[in-house]
């Protein structure tokens, strides 16, 4: 019997389109002899729709037309089953399909930050990705730094502040940044990915402009010193806290001061034929090099054995410190002047699920997807042995609690 895998993708995020690309790509590589694949598209306003044709990226060229011919759905628990049901008026809901495991392919705020998997946890359905805590910590760049520092993983120092705080204490915050780091600095929204809202500031005017831009995307901002002699390195990790392994290491190719959104997701347009030392990619979704995989990159990165070992060690430490599950990608800053690496951020649901970092190790995308799903089921089996309630019911005596009103009673 095949396993029913519901792939949830899209979402209320500035990285919505990237998630669509990643998800369609993944669905086209899943083993159809093992899985029934159920696409569930989450719109930018949070509605969910199902259509079997959502496995074809061309359908998303006209989303209103796609939704018009799709079913508005949600997922519910009915008895001991999890079902995708059509949302219609009336007592009885049409069951589209039962679901054995949920597979989220979402990126960014309101999605990758634990919001979607929190819903899965509430329902109690097995799911194939990081849990709520690791996803939430991984999304908040400031909190993630604090956790990793405690775990002995090198990260850059930062100044963090909130938008309202900045408006009230602007000059004081700017002075703190200048006194602590000088220039240049990097300004980032604290909880976005894909390089959205990130910019480099070489002086005070640019810092003010960068903060203003970042506040368009998040209310919490971080500023950190810029590494001037910089190379960026990425490494994927797959597994769980019991056992995990690292992929090959890549070096993305930057076209500007920092690795931009266009570098990550439009790089294939300029490198479709590839070039010496840089892996280019086709841009057609469903091909091996679309989405994050279209980024111009060097695989493997041309680095020393020492740096390679450092990246692999800190990637595993980061994975375990956050309690990750499934596949993640950890991005590093390599300060060539100091010959030192720092963890920049973790992507708990990475673009293209980082399959392109596993293929050089002989792991096919189909095999990687199998493992991610197996890890989701493994975690669910482990949870079945844990207690989540007691066999007592204090509400049996609730009448006595309610006599004096809930505010005056003590339980």
Predicted stretch roles:
Residues 43-46, 88, 239-242, 335-338:
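Short acidic-glycine loop/turn motifs at beta-strand connectors
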Residues 37, 126-127, 155, 185, ...:
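Hydrophobic beta-strand scaffold residues
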Residues 3-9, 13-28, 92-97, 137-229:
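Active-site nucleotide/adenylate-binding loops and adjacent lid/helix of ATP-dependent enzymes
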Residues 3, 8-12, 290-298, 302-411:
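ATP-dependent carboxylate activation and anion-phosphoryl transfer catalytic cores
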Residues 1-133, 137-139, 143, 162-172, ...:
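ATP-binding N-terminal substructure of ATP-dependent carboxylate-amine bond-forming enzymes
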Residues 38, 221-225, 233-234, 323-337:
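A short glycine-rich, hydrophobically flanked beta-strand micro-motif that places a catalytic Asp/Glu
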